[in-house]
A protein has these predicted regions:
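Conserved small/polar residues in nucleotide/adenosyl-binding loops
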Residues: 246-247
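Short acidic/polar inter-strand loop motif in beta-rich domains
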Residues: 135-141, 233-241
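N-terminal leader/pro-regions and domain N-caps
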Residues: 36-92
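Short, hydrophobic beta-strand segments
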Residues: 197-221, 233
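Extended, polar beta-sheet/loop recognition surfaces of beta-rich domains
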Residues: 138-196
């Protein structure tokens, strides 16, 4: 079985300082609020990333409109579980650390290129969910959505430190992210409902947040870190003054 190993690296970004640099070039610079003091949400104390192996019932390129990923049945393979989770906790004086008992890596497969009745249905693909918890242990995802917070929050996913597994070979384009992973935002409104249940619409294309996404892996025999950045801006994601490099 041709597999990849994916670890998670975390980064939380506040947009104010970055945007201050941008605004300093304008004739009449705007002085933003200190977003560190006025985030309008709690700081997370725990984060869980859940990866669910799926197959498709729709064209990959239509997922953000119609949905389509369906969970695969469980596998007896030791490392190839259909549902995998990695959990980090914020430790005093140490920052984000792997939670006790959490797995440290995701084991994933390169997708095969398949077509079903003319539709592009690569498999496997993986649904990726992110859950945040406050210091009390309460789920706090809604705090990044409600009261307009969805307009200034977005996750970004970047593979880094790519290297071959013990049985793989380095390739010239290993460090080109688009050659390694393909990610689509499939956030929903409401955020905690699904299109399959007919209780929500998929809005990840128009309002990408990254609490829900679908990812596929384009190479095999690779090991890498998936850097996850949660960006908190002081202006809407759709504002042209938002720094483009932070939206990649």
């Amino acid at each position: 079985m041709k597999t990849n190993v994916c670890k998670i690296a975390l980064m939380f970004l506040i947009g104010t300082a970055l945007s201050l640099l941008f605004n300093s070039c304008s004739k009449d610079p705007v002085i933003p609020e200190n977003e560190t003091d006025n985030k309008l949400h709690e700081d997370p104390s725990k984060m869980t990333i859940r990866l669910v192996e799926c197959h498709l019932h729709a064209d990959w390129n239509e997922i953000q409109k119609v949905g389509g990923p369906h969970q695969n049945p469980e596998s007896p393979a030791k490392h190839m579980k259909r549902i995998q989770e990695i959990t980090y906790e914020l430790k005093a004086g140490k920052g984000w650390r792997l939670a006790e008992g959490s797995q440290s890596k995701f084991y994933v497969q390169k997708n095969g290129d398949y077509y079903t009745y003319g539709k592009y249905t690569p498999a496997p693909v993986y649904l990726m969910f992110i859950y945040y918890y406050n210091a009390k242990g309460d789920l706090m995802n809604s705090q990044f959505i409600e009261n307009g917070q969805d307009n200034i929050h977005q996750h970004f996913f970047t593979p880094e430190n790519v290297k071959p597994t013990f049985d793989g070979q380095p390739e010239a384009d290993d460090n080109e992210p688009q050659k390694l992973v393909d990610y689509l935002y499939v956030d929903t409104t409401p955020w905690d409902k699904t299109k399959h249940s007919k209780e929500a619409e998929i809005t990840g294309d128009s309002n990408p947040i990254g609490l829900k996404g679908v990812i596929r892996f384009l190479k095999d025999r690779k090991e890498f870190d998936l850097k996850i950045r949660l960006y908190h801006g002081y202006k809407s994601k759709g504002n042209p003054e938002t720094r483009s490099e932070e939206r990649r």
